Amino acid sequence: MVSTFSRQDQNYKNDDLNQPSKEGRFGKYGGQYVPETLMPALFELETAASNAWKDKLFVKELNHLLKTYVGRETPLYEAKRLTEHYKTKHATTRIWLKREDLNHTGAHKINNALGQALLAIRMGKKRIIAETGAGQHGVATATVCARFGMKCIIYMGAEDIKRQSLNVFRMKLLGAEVKVVNSGTATLKDATSEAIRDWVSNVETTHYILGSVAGPHPFPKIVRDFHAVIGEETKKQCQESFGSLPDILLACVGGGSNAMGLFHPFIKETSVRLIGVEAAGSGVDTDKHAATITKGSVGILHGSMSLLLQDDNGQVQEAHSISAGLDYPGVGPEHSHLKDIGRAEYGSVTDQEALDALRLVSELEGIIPALETSHAFAWLDKLCPTLEKDTHIVINCSGRGDKDVNTVASSLDI
């Protein structure tokens, strides 16, 4: 089997969509599974974020920087040749791309990095740490640290450094110190573990800009809320472009931040299908994949309860994806919750399917998507033949593929 699809019966109530709880739970997922030394920092961060969103000056500064520094709002672009490619006898599927790849630094990651940097300033923290896999979150964090004159340390796995040498250079050029992580699989999971260890040791002076909707509460909510601008803009742009809500939202899922940013403003719009696409790697029936929602079970990783890839003894297993940004054995707790209650659907595609989609989108639209994003595009092959009426699909084009050129060049025969 090369790909899978998971859709639960819809069994949610309105309360299921108002998440997280005061305890930081998304249903049974989430929480704070951290050393006692981090609890005051998490409480401080939760309070700072809550107060910041109520502060008109904070919101004004954030919106000003999103516009003048990041380049928002990003366009909603109709991919007409891709639409023509997927047209069937039964339906014309109009495909729209939310162009997060056009943000400053080339991906959605800067929405969250900028917001958390402003929170760090409010808390008086001048040292910033972050983890990165594909390098995009590292670049975004290094960028905002340069903008605000903050010390920046980025943890990155040795394996990912090999795959993403261009982004490593960009981080260093921006003034960040890149710390190589050789432990474990030397990928994103291990980089995150090292960043958390640093934070435990330096919590008084340091803010950890976690890059996905994972980790202990309040990180999943904070990261989601800073990325929700993606979905808020999309909702408005859909009304302007075709006069209604979209029928389907489609995004890749590793930890799940770009998907959650797109999905969140539509959570209560239950006519809109939410579809996340994970990395099936060499296939979900092998041991080389990162399809956490599809194949995982409940466990605890990096301070949060969620679905994980783990063995019968609860040991976290290695994940695999050609995409460094999806090469993670966990997923954000809200995604696990949305899957359980049937509000969102999740599938997975292989490395080869993602590569084929990257090539197709490049040739048809003149847009080279990131390998992460290409997983979402690949799902169109499975989705479009099932549609029986004219449908508007919005794909979150979460990042550009410049960083992946070396990997793609060694994998595609061009």
UniProtKB/Swiss-Prot annotation:
Modification N6-(pyridoxal phosphate)lysine, positions: K109
Region called Disordered, residue ranges: 1-26
Gene Ontology molecular functions: tryptophan synthase activity
Keyword Phosphoprotein in annotation: no
A single Gene Ontology CC term: cytoplasm
SUPFAM superfamilies according to UniProt: Tryptophan synthase beta subunit-like PLP-dependent enzymes
Biased composition (Basic and acidic residues): 10-26
Cofactor(s) required, per the database record: pyridoxal 5'-phosphate
The keyword Amino-acid biosynthesis is assigned to this record: yes
Catalyzed reactions: (1S,2R)-1-C-(indol-3-yl)glycerol 3-phosphate + L-serine = D-glyceraldehyde 3-phosphate + L-tryptophan + H2O
Enzyme class: lyase
UniProtKB keywords: Amino-acid biosynthesis, Aromatic amino acid biosynthesis, Lyase, Pyridoxal phosphate, Tryptophan biosynthesis
EC number: 4.2.1.20
Pathway(s) annotated for this protein in UniProt: Amino-acid biosynthesis; L-tryptophan biosynthesis; L-tryptophan from chorismate: step 5/5
Record CDD domains: Trp-synth_B
Subunit and partners: Tetramer of two alpha and two beta chains.
Functional note: The beta subunit is responsible for the synthesis of L-tryptophan from indole and L-serine.
Family, per entry: Belongs to the TrpB family.
NCBIfam families the UniProt entry points to: trpB
Protein name from the UniProt record: Tryptophan synthase beta chain
Originating gene: trpB
